[in-house]
Amino acid sequence: MPAWRINTLYRAGALVSYGSDWPVVPTASPWPGIEAMVTRMDPYGRSDRVDSPGEAVDLPTAIRIFTRNGALVNKVPDSSGSLEAGKDADFIVLDRNLFEVPITEVGDVQVLMSVVGGKVLFDKRASSTGADRGDADESQ
């Protein structure tokens, strides 16, 4: 029996959402999960087996499942899940373009910056230089 019937459920119109499953998996990062949804392979390289390849989804669908669908499942679609006027200004900046790297590298993506409610909460570039996290403008 196929495991993680994501594509079957998605095509049937089910509201499919996904999470990292941390602490069951090695990291809370969503990127290995997104990679696995597309490749149907273990993103940690413990196995070369492709599990139920017919249940794979494409990268845009995997991202939608983690973002918009997550907001719908959590009943916050008016404020979260996508970048739109009137919604919370929550977003991240990544170290690479997900659509320009091999799908098998998506699990290795790193977040460079996290912005929540329009305020920088994490800036890897600033923290690596010993600078402030980006909260210099306290007037916001």
Regions found by a protein language model. Give the residues of each.
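Extracellular/periplasmic ectodomains of large secreted or surface enzymes and adhesion receptors
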Residues: 124-140
